[in-house]
Amino acid sequence: MEPNQIIELFYFFEDSFIGQYIRGSTWLFPVIESFHLIGLAVLGGSVVIGDFRLMGLILKREKIGYVIKQTRTWFKFGFFLLVSTGVPLFLSEAVKCFYSRAFWIKMICLVIGIAFTFLVRNPLVLKNQDGKLIPLLGFSSFLLWTIVAASGRWIGFS
């Protein structure tokens, strides 16, 4: 797909019924964004607790596997809330997102973060909870999710 075809797709998204409806409302965007931020807090909290445990910074008496399993449900709920609110927010300003470097950084790191969490971090941690690689996995995960959150926040300023 060429860049001009991609921008046409983004115009299509922005011109959708949902995009127009959100843009035409005074309160809808901030209400949706409020729930988006709640999702960020839930997902972010689960990331901080899980990754800080992997790095050995908190909950040192709790087994790593137990902490990861306990935070997984909250992670999934936060992610669901973020996606279900992020899509309509995106539709309301898709063209702006197309030209936003922060948006593309967020999307790339989001895909990497999800893949890393479910295909690398969690399986490795649950198989080998005492390895020397565990703190590095926690740090890498925390760094990825921090980039996702920071770049997402920066979209509002770009």
Feature names for model-found ranges:
Residues 1-158:
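Polytopic transmembrane helical bundles with strong interfacial aromatic enrichment
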